[in-house]
Amino acid sequence: MMSWWSSGANTALDEQIEKATSSSLEDIALNLEISDVIRSKTVPPKDAMRSLKKRIGHKNPNTQLSALELTDTCVKNGGQHFLVEIASREFIDNLVSLLKATGPAAVNADVRARILGLIQSWAAVTQGRVELSYIGEVYKTLQHEGFQFPPKVAVATSMIDSSAPPEWTDSDVCMRCRTPFTFTNRKHHCRNCGSCFDQQCSSKSIPLPHLGIMQPVRVDDGCYAKVTDKSRGSGGAGAGAGYDRKSPSLYSSFPHKNRSSSAMQPRSARVDDGFDEDLKKALAMSLEEVKSHSRNYAPASNGVANSGQSKVNGDSSATKTVEEEDDDLKAAIAASLADMEEQKKKHSAVLHEQTHSTEAASASTFVPPKNDYELTPVEAENINLFATLVDRLQTQPPGTILREPQIQELYDSIGTLRPKLARTYGETMSKHDTLLDLHAKLATVVRYYDRMLEERLSKAYGQRNFAGYNMHVPRQTSSPYPSLQGPSAPANVPGESFYTGQPQHDYAEPSRQPSYPPQASGAQQQFHQYAPPHQASQPSEGWQPSHTPAPAAQYAGQPPQQSTESTHSHSSAHNHQNLAAPSAPDQSLPTPTTDPAASYYFNQQQVSALQTPVSVPAEPVQSPYPNLQQQPPAQYQHSPAPQGQAQQQKPPQQPQQPYWQHSASQNTALPTNHQPWPQVPNRQSASYVQEPLPSAPQHAPQKPVVEEALIEL
């Protein structure tokens, strides 16, 4: 191919381009010849692009328009390799500079419009191709800059798809016989496929018009067979044996293409003659087919007579032959029309049967109920039209309604629709009520379902918290302290508290397990693990909900060995009730200063942490409340608290006697002198003395834990 890329070819291309653009009239034949030269890679595509760019920059507007038309033709027929050069910055930027030129260098308005139109059409057909994307970028840039483009013309992307000679591939052996290339066995390339072959496998030469190559070039045996088979197949199928004898070569009907001159020679005016010759041959072929078709429809006697007559009168005149051909052509056309009508009738009958079958099937499968009381679309439209006209009459002068016969007709027709409309309205309201009822039922079911889910969640949460305590359920007794929990009280309790007025818990009734918030679980576990029996847990005077209890490791007191199971049960129940107070500080409860009954329990002060084992005297004193027998508490050993806690403690005040409500048989005197109990290094301090055990059975069976839901349905 390098032998083609010579300076002579470039000079010839420049001459052809100059000749094609020298006139204001477009020479289509010469333009196609130049595009074939570019597509066949006879000249480098970059040189062809530069020649066109040079011609577009001419000062004559007619020359510029002709050069632009030639460039468009080459873009549509020059191949992919030429499109890459057209889409380069060198060519596109030159067009943009012509558009933006001002002053004496400004281009003509027609040239300017043609450049914009070409850029717009090229950007449309090259959309989606990466190697040609610069045209689209320039088109968008010009749009943003405010250039007025002509109306878009729909151009298919196949307009720029054209076949070009393939790129040559290299190989060390022949791609057909696998013979290695040597000094004597030279390498040759096939112009049709671009592969390497030796002299033995690529000795044939044929023109390749589909690649723009009109003179014979070297091809291998495989490509030669493919091209010749295609040409023979097209010729034999179209014209028959007689046509093959008249046109032995593929290009025999195109004499202007079988030339021995250079490729740059322009086409002559015989192009039209060749086209007419091809058209005449095609008409002759169609007439032969019509004759054979008409002979099949003709009677046998007529066929024999015609054959005899053709044998006898074989050398008849040309005019008589033309007349006979016209008659045969008319007969063939009539036969084809009759056949077409017959086929159309058959097709319509089949289509009619199919539609009837589908309609019957649809009618059998689903029959929509027909309601006589429903309004038809026409009736609804009449009602809307009547309402619209009545609204318009509100602004019209009086008497207009008398001059509008359409309103009277609509009024008469709508008056008959009142029963139907009323029935339709009634049916609609009943449907609306039914839907509302269904919606209410659904809402009720959803509410019950949500409540059931909440119950299950509360049970699961309560089981998890109880498992964390790891303790038995104590028997609940009546508490002498004001309740620090919420105002709600358990159901079915006999009496009320003296201080708060709320129902008291039964002594023998198993306690209901309350639900504690997560933040109080740690304090409750430490309290039940280390607190001694019958120790009352009361908040100190400086109580704050954010303070955390002191570590339980500082408290070394252990309960005495003689405490029974019921004593531990009683103390645990009491401690369990009082621990719920810190978890709900925001509840509306009496404060330690406002409630006189609770001031004794909340104003209890802490004493020094360095306490020694103390004992309570057994001398009773008079008390206004029913008394219980008290026994001296067991001795407890306490470890000294930190110095910071000792400084915060205050001297204890004289405590009052707590009120205890038990059975009437247990009324004894309380001790006279009250000594403060050892203070526990916790946020809650002891405020009352230890009470004696009730005379209950020592071995009473403990009731099982009954878990109840927090939310009662």
From Swiss-Prot:
Q: Where is the VHS domain?
A: 18-150
Which ranges are annotated Polar residues under compositional bias?
Answer: 303-320, 475-486, 535-547, 585-597, 624-638, 659-688
Q: Which GO terms describe its cellular component?
A: endosome membrane; ESCRT-0 complex
Q: Does the keyword RNA-binding apply?
A: no
One Pfam family this sequence matches: UIM
Q: Which UniProt keywords apply?
A: Endosome, Membrane, Metal-binding, Repeat, Zinc, Zinc-finger
Give residue ranges of zinc fingers (FYVE-type): 168-228
> Has the keyword Zinc-finger been applied to this entry?
yes
Major localization listed first in the record, in broad terms: membrane
Give the matching PROSITE patterns.
Answer: UIM, VHS, ZF_FYVE
Query: Which cellular compartments is it found in?
Result: Endosome membrane
Residue span(s) of domain UIM? 274-293, 324-343
Q: Which family does it belong to?
A: Belongs to the VPS27 family.
Entry's free-text remark on domains: The FYVE domain is involved in the binding to phosphatidylinositol 3-phosphate (PtdIns(3)P) which is required for the association to endosomal membranes.
Which PANTHER family does the record cross-reference, listed alphabetically?
VACUOLAR PROTEIN SORTING-ASSOCIATED PROTEIN 27 (PTHR47794:SF1)
Subunit description: Component of the ESCRT-0 complex composed of HSE1 and VPS27.
The protein, known as: Vacuolar protein sorting-associated protein 27
Q: Gene name?
A: VPS27
